[in-house]
């Protein structure tokens, strides 16, 4: 059923609503680890690859490959890492609205365990050094979908980004807090939620959000209470169990697409990219989440987080589903 619906939706993807992606482009050094290091240990890693990544860049790539045009505000610096990122973006047909910042881009070490679980250690760069001059360069059209990552919102520039968001008219923020949901100060988090964003959380992040907002940790009750408290849409991703969505109009659980997990790097980013592509095409939230599930299932079945599929690859992957 999901595969048949996906085959109906993919030809409908087209840019009907403007999208702007605000966030980071960084380098991911990915290595296999037989176990996570413990204090005082010295373990041997097997390097998989050095990939261009970052939540916002993964989403920009996913949107581009699905045929959705977006404005990409991904600060690029002047160092070695920045040049690698710039070249990779050029190959994807992407440009950044914020280029030639002073300093280099950040990077992270991703350790992948035998079961595919990943652990990140991050080093910040220009992607977390937002300022008013950069923001003044951005023209956000009315009715835009506006993506933010929790990594930037939890950084020292988070308050500046929220202040900018609060001044925008008629936009729909899409926020993937990621693991930083527990690091954003209460006052700033309240201001973010007052903007009525569409929030996407994974299982662990939903538990943290429930505790922070004094809501139920049971998914369906959480979704109902979320609507009552914030009057804003919510997506809760449950890996192989699919994804729940909640809005003022409807709620439900969209099944996951079957896949063989290789690693889960970029799973949440790619899901967000699929959802944004659906929403930008005018699809209802349920169909957008279905598209997000399909894109995420492809990405976790391949190495690295920057391997989002094209429409044709999705069609072939799920032709018998």
Where in the sequence are the language-model features?
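Hydrophobic residues at beta-strand termini and immediately following loops
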Residues: 73, 121, 254-255
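Conserved phosphate-binding/catalytic region of the ribokinase-like
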Residues: 2-19, 212-321
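Short acidic/glycine-enriched loop/turn segments that link adjacent beta-strands
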Residues: 103-106
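Glycine-rich phosphate/adenosyl-contacting loop at the front of the ribokinase-like
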Residues: 1-75, 80-84, 261-262
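Ribokinase/PfkB-type carbohydrate-kinase core domain
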Residues: 1-25, 86-100, 112-251
């Amino acid at each position: 059923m999901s595969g048949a619906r996906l085959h109906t939706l993919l030809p409908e993807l087209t840019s009907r609503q403007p999208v702007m992606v605000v966030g980071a482009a960084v380098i991911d050094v990915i290595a296999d680890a037989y176990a996570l290091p413990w204090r005082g240990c010295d373990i041997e890693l097997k390097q998989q690859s050095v990939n261009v990544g970052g939540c916002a860049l993964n989403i920009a790539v996913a949107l581009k490959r699905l045929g959705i045009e977006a404005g990409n505000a991904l600060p690029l610096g002047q160092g070695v890492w920045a040049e690698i990122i710039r070249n990779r973006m050029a190959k994807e047909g992407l440009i950044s609205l914020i280029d030639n910042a002073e300093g280099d881009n950040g990077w992270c070490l991703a350790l992948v365990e035998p079961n595919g679980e990943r652990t990140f250690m991050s080093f910040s760069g220009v992607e977390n050094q937002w300022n008013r001059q950069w923001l003044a360069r951005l023209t956000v059209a009315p009715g835009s979908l506006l993506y933010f990552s929790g990594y930037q919102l939890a950084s020292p520039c988070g308050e500046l980004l929220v202040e900018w968001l609060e001044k925008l008219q008629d936009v729909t923020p899409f926020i993937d807090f990621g693991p930083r949901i527990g690091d954003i100060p209460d006052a700033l988090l309240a201001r973010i939620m007052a903007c009525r964003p569409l929030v996407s959380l994974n299982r662990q992040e939903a538990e943290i959000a429930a505790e922070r907002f004094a809501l139920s940790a049971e998914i369906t009750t959480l979704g109902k209470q979320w609507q009552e408290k914030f009057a804003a849409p919510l997506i809760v991703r449950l890996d192989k169990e699919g994804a729940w969505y909640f809005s003022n109009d409807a709620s439900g659980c969209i099944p996951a697409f079957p896949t063989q997990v290789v690693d889960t790097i970029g799973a949440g980013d790619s899901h967000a990219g699929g959802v944004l592509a659906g929403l930008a095409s005018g699809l209802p939230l349920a169909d957008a989440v279905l598209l997000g599930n399909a894109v995420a299932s492809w990405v976790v079945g391949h190495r690295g987080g920057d391997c989002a599929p094209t429409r044709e690859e999705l069609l072939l992957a799920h032709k018998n589903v």
